[in-house]
Amino acid sequence: MKVVIVGGVAGGASSAARIRRLDEHAQIIMIERSGYVSYANCGLPYYVGGVIKEQEELTLQTPESFWDRFRIDVRVRQEVTAINPAEKTVTVRALDSGKSYTETYDKLLLAPGAKPTVPALSGVDSERVFTLRTVEDTLRIRRFVEDQKPKTAVLAGGGFIGLEMAENLVEMGVSVTIVQRPKQLLAPLDTDMASFVHAEMRRHGVALRLGETVTRFRQDGDSVLTLLEESEPLRSDMVLLAIGVTPDTHLAKEAGLELGIRGSIAVNERMETSVPDIYAVGDAVEVTHFVTGQKALISLAGPANKQGRIAADNICGGNSHFHGSQGSSVLKLFSLTAASTGINEKAAQAAGIAYDRVVLFPASHATYYPGAQSMAMKVLYEKESLRLLGAQIVGGEGVDKRIDVLATAIRAKMTALELTELDLSYAPPYSSAKDPVNMAGFMIEDLESGKVRQFHWNEVEDLPCDGNATLLDVRTEGEYRRGHLNGFRNIPLDDLREHLDELDRGKPVYVNCQTGLRSYLACRLLTQYGFTCAHLSGGYSFYQVVTQEQQTARSAYPCGMEKL
């Protein structure tokens, strides 16, 4: 059997190695147009920033190591320019010599990946405008940074690569501005959770120009101007385009393969395309979203590697299936970690799913053990079935652990109530006896059993401020003085029983505390004394962070934030 693989990196390289493990006698040819066949593309921003010191540390395999260990024929700096499915051949052009040749195949695997989205704007070809996708891109940026020593940079786009590059440039002393049309960074997060990311970026001096449209770029001497639709131009020493990626599928289209959403390659669960004996994996293919069942593009290394393995199994006569991806991801930003899995509120609404959510602020480990760090956790679940839909966590230590537990729970199709039963490891330096994941389950259990009701930060503006409801803040007097929601009366939780006669049982009570725990306790107390009660999900801390990121909207709130 002769297998030709178009593209290396994650999907192609993992598939090649798997084929060899399954079939020692197969002829395997891997064709890669760049000079690097298998490298850690997720580490590229950290090489630019000097966190990863040596270029060799990014290299996972070389053509020589592939041959020595696997007897795989790797051809770098060569590009497949055409596929002939009828004759089962590919046309290959050697980039250095310009010469072309034809290669036959029995099985063909396409792993072309995705290319940076470059807008059709004037000035994008400036020598000071960069994209980051390959090792060659990385070397070009690093040479520029070392030689030119830029003081300012504009990043067009606020996705994973853009934010990681922003952090690394800031650590190198570069003043960074992020500009993008969407009004929030990190699309997998909901707006409220993204507010924590915005605050962290601003805390480290990153200027955010969100909701703005770039119209063109213009080089002006040793700087480049980023022209905006409704604002003054931004002058900087360099620009990085990090708008996103587009599936690189021109070969598949020209060969007559069926295409999916946004021009991606359509494949089945066996990673087979619409043409016999042609498989496809990685960022170029559409996948089924594990939660919604809808087609999606999920450009992540984890799914690409799994798809490569599955395609290899099937190429070698197996029957393996890829059951979709839920887009689990994690990102380091200065002292913050942001992670998500499954779907967010926007995606749930688009899919027509009736859902609810809980917000909590657990600690990374037992608070009596030194070094505990807080995290904001949001868990979404379907109302009727109680199945888990997604989770988002932003904080310090322990975020990655909890998102992985929740990702596993989603994959296992657990209900939200089953989170209460998870038997997770505990010792004071690592967790609490009731892990944050357990706590999320407990909260959902209380909501669904009717033991407590909640309202959310974006509903504060709708609270009745005309005396038809009791607005109650159960934090300490000192906490209340440092900042509170306008119209809320302060009765500390520990004193609440002594003040019950001052409250009108005929009016609904809306309770607020710092993170949602004391307000929950207050609601349980009040409910048992005949009051109708709801508490603010996430508490004042959550409300404060979110509304500080939405100052214009906040100023219109009749029950907005009042600072004394």
Language-model-derived ranges and their functions:
Residues 1, 284-397, 428-432, 436-462, ...:
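Mid-to-C-terminal Rossmann-like scaffold of FAD/NAD(P)H-dependent oxidoreductases
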Residues 110-172, 207, 261, 267-269, ...:
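Glycine-rich dinucleotide-binding loop and its adjacent helix/turn
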Residues 125-149, 233-313, 405, 409:
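FAD-site-proximal beta/loop scaffold in flavoenzymes
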Residues 25-27, 69, 75-96, 103, ...:
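A Rossmann-like FAD-binding core segment of flavoenzymes
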Residues 1-77, 166-189, 328, 401, ...:
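Beta1-alpha1 glycine-rich phosphate/pyrophosphate-binding loop at the start
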Residues 6, 103-113, 156, 234-244, ...:
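Short hydrophobic core segments
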Residues 59, 152-153, 160-218, 298-304, ...:
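Rossmann-like dinucleotide-binding cores of NAD(P)H-dependent redox enzymes
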